[in-house]
Design a protein with these regions (language model features):
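Peripheral, non-catalytic segments of secretory and membrane proteins
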Residues: 20, 54, 112-114
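Non-transmembrane amphipathic alpha-helical segments
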Residues: 33, 37-51, 79-82
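Amphipathic alpha-helical packing elements
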Residues: 65-112
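Short, charged, intrinsically disordered terminal tails
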Residues: 110-124
Length: 124
């Protein structure tokens, strides 16, 4: 006959409460980052719609306006943050995000790209 030493159930409850808080914070972070992505993409879409209305038709292949370039950069940064948080939560399929949020290819391609002068320098 094998005997098990007694164990406290209170540890299980504490771990369960901690696990619940961690999952709750992960969900809240995903929600905040998803909203930030939606906001950034909406700003880009509004700019593009206004630009088409101003120019009276479909897009013409021209160099990117600095304001639009900033909007694409903001959207790609928001996308990158959202993808990283999802991966930290164990959600690895990015294609779902791209379809659900209707992320333009140019935003996808700039995801995770940072300009050399925008990086913080660390002192050594």
């Amino acid at each position: 006959m094998m005997l098990r030493p007694p164990r406290s159930r209170s540890n299980d409850r504490r771990e369960s409460a901690l696990d619940y808080e961690i999952v709750q914070e992960q969900a809240a972070a995903l929600s905040r980052l998803g909203h930030a992505l939606e906001t950034a993409l909406a700003a880009l879409w509004r700019y593009d719609r206004a630009d088409r209305d101003r120019n009276g038709g479909p897009e013409v292949e021209t160099p990117m306006h600095p304001r639009r370039e900033q909007l694409v950069r903001d959207a790609s940064d928001a996308l990158w943050c959202f993808v990283v948080q999802r991966e930290a939560c164990g959600l690895r399929d990015q294609r779902l995000i791209f379809r659900a949020y209707n992320v333009p290819a140019e935003v996808q391609n700039r995801m995770g790209v940072f300009e050399a002068n925008s990086r913080r320098r660390t002192s050594s």
